[in-house]
Amino acid sequence: MTLKSALRLVLPPVLVKAYRAVFPRPPEFRGAYKTWAEAKARAGSYAAPDILARVLEGALAVKSGRAAFERDSVTFARPELNGPLVAALSYVASATGGPLRVLDFGGALGASYWQSRPFLSPTVNITWDIVEQPNFVAAGREHFADTPLRFFGTIQEAEAATEHDVLLASGVIQYLENPGWLFDQAKASSCPYFILTRLPLQETGSDYAAVEHVPPSIYQATYPAWFFDREALWRRLRGDYEMVFDVDLQQNNNSVDPPGHVLWLLRKQR
């Protein structure tokens, strides 16, 4: 299954996250629906520019040294530490004792790589494989073949090329109609570690879907998103994983995510 078919989105995954980079206040969520279909039925259409072109422009600026990093098409002049993610990646690198081989599901053109790399040990050899939609894969292969980034259309394709140490899903699973699909993929993969970050957790007793509203100053869009019950999600995963650490992203000064978003670093049960 490709990323495009898995996401079932009203809009591309990079667009789902783009406004967070430039709009500091949390997005607005309306409703609490038992099913994805109910939330999707209440979500409207969107109008936005060519996101790939904007992301590519930003990523090329980073590659050439004209920007420090890019977050969803917006470039930044100075490095910015994403402490929880860097800590998780550093832990994996130390635990595996070899090169750090990352499988980044929905990773655009390497935004997490470009932001994290300056803060990771320069002695760690990194390969960073990204699973994305076909247009991002094509752009990535054309423009970033001379970097540690590699681009694939499916997890299976990436796994056929090499084994990996960690599967990274940053701000992704809440926009999957069936998040369990990605959990199954993670379990079947070679990755002993699984990083879930920008993960929205609540203590409501059950999962629910809401309609996320993008601030009109960015663009007009509404789309469905899951909020996961913390205990229910952990019950779903704990048979296959043990928790290495659980970080509230609001403790990170540079977080651009609403309250309740966390990073989980999980290790497969031996």
Question: How would you name each of these model-derived features?
Answer:
Residues 98-109:
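Conserved class I S-adenosyl-L-methionine
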Residues 165-179:
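A short SAM/SAH-binding and catalytic strip from SAM-dependent methyltransferases
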Residues 190-205:
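Conserved beta-strand signature within the Rossmann-like core of class I S-adenosyl-L-methionine
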Residues 1-46:
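Membrane-proximal basic amphipathic "stem/tether" segments
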Residues 43-98:
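Class I SAM-dependent methyltransferase Rossmann-like catalytic core
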Residues 175-189, 196:
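A short, conserved alpha-helix within the catalytic core of class I
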Residues 107-155:
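Class I SAM-dependent methyltransferase SAM/SAH-binding core
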Residues 220-247:
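Short alpha-helix
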